[in-house]
A protein has these predicted regions:
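A cross-family phosphate/adenosyl-ligand binding-site feature
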Residues: 1-120, 124-145
């Protein structure tokens, strides 16, 4: 059953950011989420994403920012506090690790901890996207939910 069918409104989203170039546009993604009624937004940065942005600048537009493992809040508590995880941008490296259940950083850990299906927004060029390994990883993640 979908959220539309149950009438569930998602108001609390945890955004997982990896180190793709599209990380530089994360403010646009956050603004789009706010425009559709997402009221509480937290961000978990992978180490490479944290190197690409100022966590202080993110704190100005979201409710919480998490960088290090162990994070300042327990991953299980976060999985209860937020209704959905949206990984944007998701690198090919993230997809490969996530497809095998990796938990090397906060973003991967949250993907495993969330009790609800997650949304993953891949970010790579067309040649990388077309690789059979990337497509296998996507298929695994879709199957896993």
């Amino acid at each position: 059953m979908t959220e539309a069918e149950t009438g569930t409104v998602v108001e609390r989203v945890l955004v997982g950011c990896t180190g793709a170039l599209q990380m530089l546009s994360i403010g646009d993604y956050i603004a789009a989420m706010r425009s559709v009624g997402i009221r509480r937004i937290g961000v978990v940065l992978s180490p490479s994403a944290a190197a690409m942005t100022s966590p202080a600048s993110l704190e100005a537009i979201v409710n919480e920012v998490f960088i290090e493992l162990p994070m300042t809040r327990n991953h299980i508590a976060l999985s209860r506090d937020y209704q959905r995880l949206v990984v944007v941008p998701a690198t090919a490296n993230f997809l490969a690790s996530a497809a095998t259940g990796g938990a090397r950083n906060g973003v991967e850990l949250m993907l495993i901890a969330m009790p609800t299906p997650s949304v993953i927004v891949p970010a790579m060029n067309g040649a990388m996207w077309a690789k059979p390994a990337v497509q296998r990883n996507i298929a695994t993640l879709v199957e896993d939910g």
